[in-house]
Amino acid sequence: GVFEGTDKGAFNPTGILTREQAAKIVAVMLLGEEDANKLSTNSTTFKDVAANRWSAGYIGYCVQQGILAGTGNGNFDPEGELTGLAFAKMMLVALGYDAKVANYVGNDWAINVAADAVNAGIAPKGIVLADAMTREQAAQMAFQTLTADMVYYTNKGTTVIGSDGMQVI
């Protein structure tokens, strides 16, 4: 499934979501479990992600899709903690938002992500997006993302497709 237990077999709902766990969540949401689990790589872009690491395929997919990037100096920090803002940005990009067009890069990225996450209905009530995100909060945000509107950019502007498949804008 999208969420599995830790290597100790527990869901660990209050554990903090890591960057590599987030990559798996997004890959499974976009590709489906069967196809996401087939992702593999012979080499990686990052010094700290071995090609045989359990998450290397998910990370590679998310980087290739523009959903995730490294942390600098050729590193990814796969076990690094993720904030609610960072995960919301991933979810929004997965919904079709263009990070550059939506201004999710630069100094005001956090403000723009927070506003769009709330407007899109993917931010669970009662969480502080600037804080580290727990696994249970990530599960809730991922669920809410599954029912959110998709966004498509065309040469005529932005098109929003509702979760029911109907064009909204």
List each language-model region with its residue ranges.
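Feature responds to low-complexity, polar/acidic, surface-exposed segments characteristic
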Residues: E4-A56, Q65-L85, L92-A132, L146-I169
